[in-house]
Amino acid sequence: MSEKIHFTKMHGAGNDYIYVDTTLYNIKDPAAAAIAWSDRHKGIGSDGLVLIGRSPLPEADFTMRIFNADGSEAMMCGNASRCIGKYLYERTHPWPLPCKEGDGYQETVIRLLTLSGIKLLFLRIVNGIVESVTVDMGEPVFENERQFNPVIQPPSPRRGAEGEAGSLFVSMGNPHYVIFTNDVDAVETKGCELEFHAAFPERCNIEFAEMRPDGIRVRVWERGSGITQACGTGACATAVAACKTGRSGRKNRIIMDGGELEIEWNEADNHVYMTGPAEFVFEGEIEDPLPAPPLGGVWSAIKIKK
């Protein structure tokens, strides 16, 4: 008889994933599950699958693995990290980590092990509910031969009137190519082409960004998922690129299709800090058939609880 796996769907600024606690359930083929479950017509519908586990290392508390909607595994996801923070705190009783008391709120820190290293999640809690999560995304990298070949230049807008670059490669653990433009909707026609451009050996996430008085308007094409409502690492890469090219200061409001994120590129430690919301959508059970289905197989969701 097929095992039923409990899942929780969450989103951060519209970037939605399916979350499964691997301390309770074993998914035999995560890549196939991500493809099937992410289907918005025949599955649960999401940008991918996130697996939560206990860390095997004493330096971290929990682990995160992310599989995109096409089954490929991602190094890091800022929005998923925030959702994991909310999920863990509100679903773990009693809470095992120290909490700091503030004026009408509490704070706790989670050390999350990802494929791009350990990330710190700073949770702000009011009346037992996680109000917001700030993630230390680490330092940006501008040169990474494994992710970007500068000899093969991808298409880029002309330089601005004062000579600032029209685009910039930024790695936030995963690769991003940020293009400054007045037409962010061009992501719909150019995103896929750029993801697979020869300049990016491991493919690339693509951001089309427009500088506005109220912040930076960004639309994103995520590697392995296509157009998404938001991308945490993409928001960080865009803010860093805007600052690096002289378009903005170190604190930026990033306006994406699904919501807004606050990004700070801290001058003292060179780390990028991302703050934003995390929300539950629904939960339910889904069957994990034996053996694992072939890629593209569909697993039917049952007992959805709003």
Task: Please report, for each region that a protein language model flagged, where it lies by residue.
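A glycine-rich beta-to-alpha transition motif near the start of alpha/beta enzyme domains, typified by
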Residues: 1-99, 104-129, 177-290
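Intrinsically disordered, low-complexity segments enriched in serine/threonine/proline/glycine
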Residues: 100, 104, 165, 301-304
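Glycine-biased, low-complexity coil/linker segments
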Residues: 101-103, 159-161, 296-298
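Generic short N-terminal amphipathic or hydrophobic helices
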Residues: 109, 151, 301-303
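Short, solvent-exposed secondary-structure boundary/capping segments
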Residues: 129-137
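C-terminal domain-closing interface element
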Residues: 140-143, 150, 168-170, 271-291, ...
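Cationic, low-complexity basic patches in intrinsically disordered or flexible, solvent-exposed regions
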Residues: 154
